[in-house]
Regions:
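Transmembrane beta-barrel domains of outer membrane proteins
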Residues: 62-64, 107-111, 146-150, 188-190
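Outer-membrane beta-barrel "beta-signal"
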Residues: 30-32, 103-109, 179-191
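Outer-membrane beta-barrel biogenesis signature
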Residues: 4-35, 118, 155
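Short glycine/proline- and aromatic-enriched beta-strand/turn motifs that initiate or cap beta-hairpins
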Residues: 20-65, 190
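Residues that define the transmembrane beta-barrel architecture of outer-membrane proteins
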Residues: 27-29, 53-59, 96-102, 121, ...
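Transmembrane beta-barrel strands of outer-membrane/channel proteins
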Residues: 31-39, 75-79, 104, 125-131, ...
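Gram-negative (and chloroplast) outer-membrane scaffold detector with strong preference
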Residues: 65-141, 153-155
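Predominantly the C-terminal beta-signal and adjacent terminal strand-loop region
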Residues: 21, 42, 73-87, 149-191
Length: 191
């Protein structure tokens, strides 16, 4: 009986430590900073015209809070710009424009369900709302996803690739402030 209890405890501790290794902890904070590119497609298909890109002062930063093993909330700010003689939604620009956005997204981390043995990889889907400004101001519904590669065993330093589609609420009357995609490459630090 003692051997059975000892084996049961050993298995229990092993499973518990494995689960902790592969899941995000509650109450964790993360800070990320990096670059972004904007694909200003407007209402056009991203597969038919993926050529309208903005990459001028491409700074992005975010703070993320995990309230459970699989859910987090992220607040981000993004700066970018469009230079003269480039296009937004098929319209050539006659002057430079600055892009700024503030986004609040909920993230669902599901990578551990697909790759349970890869503790250095996290996959997420995100959805939320955003505020952005180019020539006018608009509000967007955000939908996207990404992947996070942890670069150390403690999972305190990583690299994230993330894409978010921003769908403008008032897009028929918005001019340049219309539907677009944001692509991010960020360094992530656990606080």
């Amino acid at each position: 009986m003692k051997k059975f209890i000892l084996i049961a405890l050993l298995v229990s501790f092993s499973i518990s430590s494995f689960a902790q290794r592969n899941s995000r902890a509650n109450d964790d904070w993360y800070l990320s900073i990096g670059v972004n590119a904007i694909n200003s497609l407007g209402t056009r298909s991203p597969f038919n015209s993926p050529s309208d890109w903005a990459f001028d002062l491409p700074i992005s930063a975010a703070a993320e809070y995990n309230w459970s093993d699989t859910f987090a909330i992220e607040q981000s700010v993004t700066f970018n710009g469009f230079t003269e003689d480039t296009e937004i939604d098929g319209t050539e620009l006659s002057k430079d424009y600055t892009y700024i956005s503030f986004d609040t997204n909920v993230k669902y981390y599901f990578g551990q369900f697909i790759f349970p043995n890869l503790d250095w990889l996290e996959i997420h889907a995100n959805a939320g709302v955003g505020f952005f400004h180019i020539d006018e101001t608009n509000i967007s519904a955000n939908l996207g996803g990404g992947v996070l590669f942890w670069l150390n065993a403690n999972r305190t330093f990583g690299l994230r690739l993330q894409t978010t589609g921003k769908f403008a609420f008032n897009h028929p009357e918005s001019g340049f402030d219309n539907n677009h995609f944001q692509h991010h490459l960020q360094v992530v630090f656990k606080l």
